[in-house]
């Protein structure tokens, strides 16, 4: 690890006698794929973003307790997320366990104190020798910063970036917070319509007509869909549509995520065509998925024709509404063959819950997680017909009687 910033310190208790490898294995195993590869602990260690996990353990009276230290050079938000992930571990081996965060030590704090004290000394000496006017310096710095601040555009005083007048291209977003976040990463040719009120400001309509390229950059939720509908109904010139990841908002994206979303923008006509396809019957999606599987797995014609009953199944409207709410919740929903709710569970518990269900009780599983080989095989043994997840993991062999889709297949990108 090249630069240590923080040390995550936790304590734990286990209702049984365990060893250090058991604790470390539980941490790796139960945090795997919670937030995708980006926050996989092993990968973070390989990249030098996390250090070696230190475990001290004491077994007494058939129980174990101890503490854990995890060095981190991630930022504050990412480090807090790692701490929360480790706290979510509930079992070590077959025994119930409880992990609790005690503190996140900022190892740079002492160094920062010394730097601040030294800076005070330098400033005192400098002021004494040069008679420096600090206010003058601060005003100069403040003036430079203001060039990247928000401006107000049009008679509606809409939040906008400073290049909204001069840049030949334009990015339209929903609100003020989106503009601020884009400015943070250097995107200054922006204007906000301020919410899905059903009425787009006329100044945005006129502004779009004079731009070479106009991008609607919207949240990855139903609110983003509403904004796009309002823009189209108001005859705003839109050339491309870019969306934040499903369930995410533009205001919370990192610079890397913003760049990726904008690079994935597609022409408006193509986007609308995709939307129409996404609201078509689920049967057509499953049929398409079956055709792809036929080519990928070189299935025989007889195997493709067998799930005819499954292909005809459609997702009811009320279930579609539940699906749209799933992204970002880390929850899963299990339905029976008539789309009646069987149970709502946390993603981390979905394997255990499915194992305990009677065969035939679960026909459809929709969850905010990764579809894995283990889940797929268990679902096949429980006669599950359809699984919908955030994404599909490394699947080596797909059971013929289970169809798999992503949330994007069902509710659009």
Curated annotation (Swiss-Prot):
Reactions catalysed, as given in the entry: ssDNA + n NTP = ssDNA/pppN(pN)n-1 hybrid + (n-1) diphosphate
Assigned GO CC terms: cytoplasm; DNA-directed RNA polymerase complex; exosome (RNase complex); primosome complex
GO molecular function: DNA-directed RNA polymerase activity; metal ion binding; poly(A) binding
Enzyme Commission (EC) number: 2.7.7.101
Keywords: DNA replication, DNA-directed RNA polymerase, Exosome, Magnesium, Metal-binding, Nucleotidyltransferase, Primosome, Transcription, Transferase
Disulfide topology: none
Cofactor(s) needed: Mg(2+)
Any single GO BP term: DNA replication, synthesis of primer
Toprim domain residues: 168-246
Recorded superkingdom: Archaea
Note on cofactor: Binds two Mg(2+) per subunit.
Residues that coordinate or bind Mg(2+) 2: 219, 221
Protein family per UniProt: Belongs to the archaeal DnaG primase family.
Assembly and oligomerization: Forms a ternary complex with MCM helicase and DNA. Component of the archaeal exosome complex.
Alphabetical list of HAMAP family matching this protein: DNA_primase_DnaG_arc
Function: RNA polymerase that catalyzes the synthesis of short RNA molecules used as primers for DNA polymerase during DNA replication. Also part of the exosome, which is a complex involved in RNA degradation. Acts as a poly(A)-binding protein that enhances the interaction between heteromeric, adenine-rich transcripts and the exosome.
Name of this protein: DNA primase DnaG
Species of the source: Metallosphaera sedula (strain ATCC 51363 / DSM 5348 / JCM 9185 / NBRC 15509 / TH2)
């Amino acid at each position: 690890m090249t630069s240590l910033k923080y040390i995550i310190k936790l304590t734990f208790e286990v209702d049984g006698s365990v060893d250090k490898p058991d604790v470390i294995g539980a941490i790796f195993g139960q945090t795997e794929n919670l937030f995708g590869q980006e926050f996989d602990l092993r990968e973070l260690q390989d990249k030098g973003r996390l250090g070696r996990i230190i475990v001290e353990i004491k077994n007494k009276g058939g129980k174990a307790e101890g503490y854990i230290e995890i060095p981190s050079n991630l930022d504050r938000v990412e480090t807090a997320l790692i701490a929360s992930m480790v706290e979510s571990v509930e079992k070590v081996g077959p025994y119930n366990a409880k992990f609790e965060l005690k503190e996140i030590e900022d190892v740079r704090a002492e160094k920062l104190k010394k730097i601040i004290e030294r800076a005070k000394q330098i400033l005192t000496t400098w002021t004494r020798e040069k008679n420096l006017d600090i206010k003058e310096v601060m005003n100069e710095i403040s003036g430079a910063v203001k060039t990247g601040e928000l401006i107000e555009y049009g008679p509606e005083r809409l939040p906008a970036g400073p290049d909204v007048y001069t840049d030949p291209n334009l990015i339209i977003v929903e609100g003020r917070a989106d503009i601020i976040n884009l400015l943070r990463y250097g995107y200054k040719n922006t204007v906000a319509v301020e919410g899905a009120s059903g009425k787009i400001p006329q100044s945005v309509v006129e502004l779009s007509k004079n731009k070479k390229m106009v991008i609607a950059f919207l949240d990855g939720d139903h609110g983003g869909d509403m904004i796009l509908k309002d823009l189209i109904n108001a005859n705003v010139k839109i050339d491309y549509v870019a969306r934040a990841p499903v369930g995410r908002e533009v205001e919370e994206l990192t610079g890397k995520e913003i760049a990726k979303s904008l690079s994935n923008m597609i022409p408006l006509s193509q986007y609308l065509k995709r939307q129409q396809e996404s609201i078509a019957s689920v049967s057509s999606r499953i049929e398409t998925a079956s055709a792809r599987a036929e080519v990928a797995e070189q299935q025989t014609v007889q195997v493709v024709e067998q799930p005819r009953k499954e292909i005809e199944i459609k997702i009811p409207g009320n279930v579609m509404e539940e699906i749209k709410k799933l992204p970002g919740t880390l929850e899963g929903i299990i339905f029976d063959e008539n789309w009646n709710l069987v149970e709502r569970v946390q993603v981390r518990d979905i394997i255990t819950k499915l194992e305990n269900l009677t065969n035939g009780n679960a026909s459809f599983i929709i969850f905010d997680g990764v579809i894995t080989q283990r889940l797929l095989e268990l679902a096949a043994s429980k006669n599950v017909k359809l699984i919908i997840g955030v994404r599909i993991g490394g699947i080596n062999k797909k059971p013929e009687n289970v169809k798999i889709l992503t949330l994007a297949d069902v509710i659009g990108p």
